[in-house]
């Protein structure tokens, strides 16, 4: 709270970013222990520093709840809002990409299913945060990577978020 209070004294708003690297986690932690890169689907790609494992539906739900818990703590710490990071190949972008997300369950396949992770995160934030909390989204319009999110996928996700008024602003990377 010290930092947010100091910033507020100068009339400035404070936001925190919420992100999960998914497949883009580093291969080892600071102790040299091999890390697990959880992703929508198993992935072998030069952007991945560790072998990926497919997320189970239970882990997906746990991660979504983790976004909300973290956002609640940030608001309690004096942040004015949070920004969901769905850019630069992080986990929400991995779910959006039909080349990365090759699931056949409710989390993959159709465009609507691939959007489910991002929409469920935003819906839960709206449910659990006070109305005064600002919720934003950072998304890459075109990741310029053969496995990355393409403009049509990003624009469709933005339209779905807008249709439900789930975010207050969009930060296009």
Per-range role (PLM):
Residues 1-173:
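Flavin-dependent oxidoreductase catalytic cores
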């Amino acid at each position: 709270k010290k930092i947010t209070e100091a910033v507020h004294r100068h009339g400035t708003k404070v936001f925190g970013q919420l992100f999960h690297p998914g497949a883009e986690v580093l291969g080892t932690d600071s102790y040299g222990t091999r890390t697990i890169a959880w992703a929508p689907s198993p992935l072998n790609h030069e952007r991945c520093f560790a072998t990926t494992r497919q997320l189970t539906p239970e882990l997906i739900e746990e991660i979504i709840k983790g976004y909300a818990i973290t956002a609640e703590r940030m608001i309690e710490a004096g942040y004015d809002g949070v920004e969901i990071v769905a850019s630069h190949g992080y986990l929400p972008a991995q779910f959006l990409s039909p080349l990365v997300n090759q699931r056949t369950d409710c989390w993959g396949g159709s465009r609507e299913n691939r959007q489910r992770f991002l929409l469920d995160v935003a819906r839960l934030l709206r449910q659990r945060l006070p109305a005064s909390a600002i919720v934003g989204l950072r998304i890459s319009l075109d990741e310029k990577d053969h496995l990355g999110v393409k403009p049509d996928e990003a624009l469709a996700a933005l339209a779905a978020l807008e249709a439900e008024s789930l975010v207050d602003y969009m930060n296009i990377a």
